[in-house]
Every structure is written in structure tokens, then in C-alpha cells.
Regions:
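Beta-strand-rich binding/interaction modules
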Residues: 222-262, 272-278, 284-294
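Short, exposed coil/turn segments at beta-strand boundaries within extracellular/luminal domains
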Residues: 295-300
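Low-complexity, Pro/Ser/Thr- and charge-rich linker/hinge segments at domain boundaries
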Residues: 304-322, 478, 482
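Catalytic beta-strand/loop cores that center a nucleophilic Ser/Cys/Thr
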Residues: 66-77, 342-346, 358-458, 475-516
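Substrate-binding/catalytic cleft of secreted carbohydrate-active enzymes
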Residues: 1-185
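Short, solvent-exposed loop/turn segments at secondary-structure junctions
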Residues: 26-28, 96-99, 172-174, 229, ...
Length: 516
């Protein structure tokens, strides 16, 4: 590091008006010099640091989403403790970089000497696999999810004091390094239609209202509580700022109010009051939006509210993780919710809640999936509040998940109710929730853990309840059909001791007692 140190010293002497740093993304060790030696720390010549992680107490401490989004979704996380250990201003390095499924409508824009053979290869592969018509939906759904992740990343930075700033790698795609389509704009700087500029400015503007809430999913017997604060990076402090708040669902206004006026100095983490809302008036599963407005500044967040106990009218519905029991019920014309364990899925693909980072081709040590494409108008999801793309209420269902079912070999004509968007380097048809007629029976398959322990989670309970209610009331058989042999192609029995979760035919399906 002697050359950069010498160069910086010369530049600082030649032009002291500017601030200089020798590197970015260096993973500096910031322990006390007596522990590590001064040579391990950033050069004294550096005026500031640009890092995505630093070494503290022998551990790498991350400062962007990958280090935080593997835990229950919340808006309380920050990296203040990391910043407290540094003695120089620090900016986070290239936050975001969430991959969006390539926009194939970009192909005709290449009219010069460069040919987009990567996009052409993806297009041809999708066509071969019968998925080409879904490509625009893959781009839109993965892009909407990426936009939400960018919002969460920026807010994570704004909640961290005294952070000097954050860097986004870019807002447009990088066509190289394995096709790194990580932007809201394509390689030609044209919008993909996945991010609303006004909504993005709410979180990337000069004054940003923020909330700290411990989770995103609530039950209706709880009280929603959040702390309000501001990040003010405008030109001046703000005096007597009054904040209006409201919590609203598609069914109407849940609650509203105003916080006492406060002064907002420059910088981040300035408290502005607290909100408490009893949720007992919410009588059905819903998604609600909390909105804060303070003058021209505005910001909003979604939360999900579900009943504390999902009552299931399971009359005529059999719920089981056992392939043997599912097939036996189907032969009797039963309505079955089959929830296979990871080991039971023969044709499976690892999944993750988060989309792949940068590119599934460049970084191959990740699941590579790119979020969900959801038929949120399907009656199977009538009691499970969801948009048509991944959002925070899916985190607990996908973390962990048995994986997605690869449907390429059974050629179902219908799209899955909940489809996992595969990496563009594979382009498999992946089902998380899908249905088929099996003989005279109606089968819904959900690759999620509905064990007793897992059902402590409100969203898992609600998803199971919604699927069971759909099966109990459905009067139209699925258009697709699977044979018993095709089920064996996709799944396998994994234990003689598999137990049903609920099924009125459970006793009929128990093996006969051994002969004496």
C-alpha cells in the first residue's frame, strides 16, 4: 500500500480542497493497532473509507443487504455498532446488485457492431422450455422485488449513524460479467418499468421519513408499534416538522394520526415520535400500508396482518407430507394438499428468498433463483394476501424451503399458482404451489414446511389455511392431469413413519396391524 499512500500524500498537498481515499472494497481491519499492527488498518492518508465489510474482532462485519436480509424482515437493523469502531468517515460500497430477469425486449435495440448473443441464448432456451411467453412477467416480477430490496438497502444505510453515505453500483444493467442485469434501467438507460421514479425518490431524496418496526407480519391480537425518525441530507436543518401517519388496507383506513412537531437537524437518526395501533379491528387477512408524510417528504411500508389462529374447515380435505397417503386418498377421489419434504422431491431445485446477487453465471455458489411469479388472483390464494411478486411475507415460507419442484418432465400446460423464477442460465419450470387432477381426485402440491413446529409462523398457517379452504370449496377440477406414475417421477416416499397433519381419512390409510 506504500504507492497509494505516497500518491495520496502528493495529491493532498497539490489540491487540499478535495477528499481522497486510496481504495474501495478493501476489507480493512479496524481493530486497535496493538492487536493487529498498524499495517492492517487503513492508511493514515485516507480521508474516508468506502467498504462493504470490515474486519472487527477477527470477524467480517457486512454493511449491505446480504449481511442482514437472511433474518426475519424488519426495519430496525442498522450497522451503527460497526461505525462506532471506525475513526474515519465511511461510505457503503455498491449496495444492491440484485439481479433482475433479463428483458428480452431489449434485443432489437442492438443495431450496431455488438450482438446480444447472451440475450439471444436466453430467449432460445426459454422457447425450448416453453417459457418464452412468460419472459416479460419474469422481468416485471423480479424487478418489482429488486426495487423493494433496494429500498430496504437504502433505508438500512440511512438508519446507520454516523454513516457518511452510500454508493449504488449503478441504476442500469451491466451486460458483461455473466449478464449482470441489476438495474432499473436497461443497458441503453431506458426504463424497464419495474421502479416508479417518484416512489424511489421517497427513499433516495434529501429528506427521508423512516420507521423502526421489529417485524413485517402481525396477528390481529397484537398492537403495531413503530418508532419514527428522519434522515435529513437537505441543505439545512428543518424546524417544527409535523408528521402525519396513516395505516390503510384495501378494505379501508385502519388508523391515522399526527405526531408532535419536532426540529430535524442535518444528518440521520433523528427521532420524531412513536406510533401504536391496536390491530383488533382487522377481521380478515390483509396487507396494510403505513404511510408517513412530512411536508414534501413521504415514505411508506407494507405490513401483513392475519388472524392469530387460522381456522380450517377441512371437511373432505386431506393434508399430508406422505406421498403414499396422498396417492391413497386420491384414488378414492379425495381432495389432497400434499406438502413434500425436501428429501421427497426427486426433481428439485434449491431456492432462496433473495434473488441472486450480480449474476448466476458469474457467482455460481448461490441458488440462482430470482423470486416468485404469483397468480395472486387464483382462488387458492384468496385468504393469503399477496401481490404477484415476492414480498416480505414470503420470507418465512421460503426460509427454509424444501425447494421448488422441477416440472419440465411432466409438461403441465397451466402455470403454477406460485412459480419460482429460475436463473436465466437454467430456465427450468419451477413450481412452489401447483395443482392437478389425479384420477378422480384433486391434488394441490405445496413445497413448504407445514410441520407442527413450522406452523408457529403466522404466514405458514395462513397459506395452509387458504389452500385447504380452496380445496374444500373448489367445484371445478384442475385443467391439468397427473398420473400416479408421473407423481412417482416427481416425488418419492421417504419414511414409513410419515404422519398426516390433518385428514379425515387418516385411519383408513393406516397400515393394518401386524398379524399375531
Amino acid at each position: 500500500m506504500q504507492i497509494p499512500k505516497t500518491l495520496l500524500a502528493e495529491l493532498q498537498q497539490a489540491d487540499p480542497r478535495r477528499l481522497y481515499t486510496s481504495t474501495s472494497n478493501r476489507f480493512w481491519i479496524v481493530d486497535a493497532p496493538e492487536k493487529t499492527g498498524e499495517k492492517d488498518g487503513p492508511p493514515e492518508t485516507d480521508d474516508f473509507l468506502v467498504e462493504r465489510a470490515i474486519h472487527i474482532d477477527g470477524k467480517i462485519q457486512g454493511m449491505r443487504g446480504q449481511a442482514f436480509f437472511d433474518r426475519e424482515p424488519n426495519t430496525t437493523d442498522d450497522f451503527c455498532a460497526i461505525l462506532a469502531r471506525t475513526n474515519k468517515p465511511l461510505l457503503t460500497h455498491e449496495i444492491g446488485q440484485w439481479n433482475v430477469f433479463p428483458n428480452l425486449a431489449e434485443i432489437p435495440k442492438y443495431k450496431g457492431v455488438l450482438r446480444p448473443i447472451n440475450l439471444e441464448a436466453i430467449r432460445d432456451d426459454l422457447k425450448k422450455n416453453g417459457l418464452l411467453s412468460q419472459a416479460p412477467d419474469f422481468t416485471r416480477a423480479s424487478g418489482k422485488f429488486a426495487a423493494e430490496l433496494y429500498k430496504q438497502e437504502i433505508e438500512l444505510a440511512l438508519r446507520s449513524h454516523p454513516l457518511a453515505g452510500y454508493q449504488l453500483l449503478d441504476l442500469h444493467d451491466y451486460p458483461g460479467q455473466g449478464t449482470a442485469h441489476v438495474g432499473f434501467l436497461d443497458s441503453f438507460w431506458d426504463s424497464k418499468g419495474v421502479a416508479d421514479p417518484a416512489a424511489f425518490r421517497e427513499v433516495a431524496g434529501p429528506v427521508v421519513p423512516l420507521v423502526r418496526m421489529p417485524k413485517r407480519v402481525y396477528t390481529s391480537n397484537e398492537t403495531f408499534a413503530a418508532k419514527v425518525e428522519f434522515a435529513n441530507f437537505s441543505q439545512q436543518p428543518l424546524a417544527a416538522v409535523s408528521t402525519k401517519w396513516e395505516l390503510r388496507s384495501p378494505e379501508g383506513l385502519i388508523a391515522e394520526g399526527n405526531l408532535p412537531a419536532v426540529d430535524i437537524p442535518l444528518g440521520a437518526c433523528h427521532p420524531a415520535g412513536e406510533i401504536q395501533i391496536p390491530l383488533s379491528g382487522v377481521t380478515k387477512p390483509t396487507v396494510a400500508t403505513l404511510t408517513l408524510t412530512a411536508g414534501a417528504a413521504k415514505n411508506s411500508w407494507r405490513i401483513w396482518i392475519v388472524p392469530p389462529a387460522a381456522t380450517i374447515d377441512a371437511k373432505g380435505v386431506f393434508v399430508t407430507p406422505s406421498l403414499r397417503e396422498a396417492k391413497a386418498a386420491l384414488t378414492k377421489g379425495g381432495r389432497v394438499l400434499y406438502t413434500p419434504a425436501k428429501a421427497a422431491i426427486r426433481q428439485r431445485q434449491d431456492t432462496a428468498f433473495l434473488p441472486c446477487f450480480w449474476s448466476p453465471v458469474y457467482f455460481t455458489n448461490q441458488a440462482g433463483t430470482m423470486g416468485l411469479l404469483i397468480d395472486n388472483k387464483h382462488p387458492a390464494l384468496a385468504d393469503f394476501p399477496t401481490a404477484d411478486h415476492t414480498d416480505w411475507q414470503w420470507w418465512s415460507i421460503l426460509t427454509p424451503s424444501p425447494g421448488a419442484v422441477v416440472l419440465d418432465q411432466v409438461a403441465l400446460k397451466s402455470k403454477p399458482i406460485v412459480q419460482v423464477i429460475d436463473a436465466f442460465s437454467r430456465n427450468q419450470k419451477l413450481g412452489l404451489v401447483f395443482e392437478a387432477k389425479v384420477g378422480a381426485g384433486h391434488l394441490v402440491i405445496c413445497a413448504a414446511d407445514f410441520s407442527e413446529a413450522a406452523l408457529q409462523d403466522p404466514m405458514r398457517r395462513q397459506l395452509r389455511s387458504s389452500l385447504v379452504r380452496y380445496l374444500s370449496k373448489s367445484k371445478t377440477p384442475p385443467s391439468d392431469e397427473l398420473t400416479s406414475a408421473q407423481l412417482d417421477q416427481l416425488f418419492q416416499g421417504v419414511s414409513d413413519n410419515e404422519k398426516t397433519i390433518h385428514g379425515e381419512w387418516a385411519k383408513d390409510l393406516e397400515p393394518p396391524p401386524p398379524k399375531k
